[in-house]
A protein has these predicted regions:
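Surface-exposed cap/loop segments at beta↔alpha junctions
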Residues: 48-139
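Solvent-exposed coil/turn segments that connect beta secondary-structure elements
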Residues: 76-78, 93-97, 191-193, 234-236, ...
Length: 357
């Protein structure tokens, strides 16, 4: 597998991409794809004068076998050692990190599908925002039912990258920015259910019984969860706007974990009715709910004859995890991250999972 390094030049309304080098002599590569945050990469390579001139901050790094993820070099570290040799560590994140350079300004009140809300935020701050534009940036493809659900919300001054991935985690979708010729395309999508709880798609089961689960650890903690929100908005005293929010049936007794959400700075604009304003408060309440904390670490077979990563399953998909020896099964668990590692020992896969309720 080769790495391709491109020079990126930003002009007023477009970008220009030119191939600078092709590299296959790196010592190691980490390629970390995440579903609810911006992914990242690391290249560890001998620090020759040629490599130092090739790997420059702001340039694009991509893999010859991945047409969806493009990294931008953000950090370089050069280390010289008379005995061990000279090495260059190149790190960065995928192109969605460009959205971190903008905030949502001014206040945006939006009502419609989540797709429409994202389009409005990006249009006002990234696409049709004058000198605030990201050159060549536009919306790409949209897929997944979660993006067609509707909401009303008010948002201001949030960092766009943090806001977007926070929204993604709330609704169960994701976003990715990719190169399309000399353009930047922002795709919105969702994962596919491949667990044992459905029959529309082939099942993906990682299990010690199938020899495709090399190691597995799991921990759960209820202490951090919040499942019922009291949301207070604008106004004073008895006139203060207030509502509550929970997901599904209202929790009771020992199953109820409450949180207070202060939205006094969320103004009710003249064209917003009381009912619409309460929906805005409910959206904020949804963002402050916290699921029980779970953590799992595992290693899965990189060269399994049963399932191939990025062919049979992808980051964001729902799969089944089973540890038969201890009688532990997670029938529907989401793959929210995958670190692919390439080094002298070959290729390895380290997944991150999020348990579903």
């Amino acid at each position: 597998m080769q790495l391709e390094i491109y020079n990126l030049i930003a002009e007023e309304n477009r970008i220009s991409i030119s191939l600078e080098a092709i590299c296959d002599s790196y010592s190691s590569l980490l390629w970390d794809i995440e579903f609810y945050q911006c992914g990242c990469f690391e290249v560890y390579i001998a620090a020759s004068p040629q490599n130092v001139s090739i790997f420059q901050r702001g340039r694009i790094v991509t893999r010859s076998d991945d047409a969806q993820h493009f990294g931008i070099i953000e950090s370089l570290q050069l280390e010289t050692d008379a005995e061990k040799g000279d090495y260059l560590t190149v790190t960065g994140r995928f192109l969605a990190c460009l959205l971190e350079r903008r905030i949502i300004y001014p206040t945006i009140t939006a009502n419609g599908s989540y797709e429409d809300i994202v389009r409005k935020v990006l249009s006002h701050n990234v696409i049709s925002a004058g000198i605030r534009n990201l050159p060549g940036f536009s919306m790409g493809t949209v897929s997944g039912d979660c993006w067609q659900k509707t909401a009303r919300m008010q948002v201001s001054y949030d960092n766009i990258l943090e806001w977007l991935y926070g929204l993604c985690e709330t609704i169960g979708g994701s976003a990715n920015v990719r190169l399309d010729g000399n353009a930047l395309k922002c795709d919105l999508f969702s994962g596919t259910d491949r667990s044992l709880l459905q029959d529309d798609n082939p099942h993906i089961v990682f299990s010690d019984a199938y020899n495709n689960l090399l190691s597995f650890s799991y921990a759960a903690d209820d202490a951090v969860q919040k499942n019922f929100a009291y949301v207070l908005g604008c106004g004073e005293g008895n006139a203060k706007k207030r509502t509550t929010f929970c997901s599904g049936a209202e929790p009771t007794y020992l199953d109820r974990y409450e949180v207070y959400v202060d939205e006094r700075n969320t103004a009710q604009e003249e064209d917003v009715t009381d009912a619409e304003y309460l929906e805005i408060l409910k959206s904020s309440g949804a963002e402050h709910l916290v699921q029980p904390k779970t953590a799992s670490e595992s290693a899965i077979a990189a060269f399994s004859t049963q399932y191939q990563y990025n062919k049979d399953y992808f980051v964001g998909d729902y799969v089944t995890m089973e540890q038969k020896r201890f009688g532990l099964i997670q029938p529907r668990i989401q793959l929210i991250g995958m670190v692919e590692s390439f080094d002298q020992n070959g290729r390895s896969l380290t997944p991150t999972f999020k348990e579903m309720e």
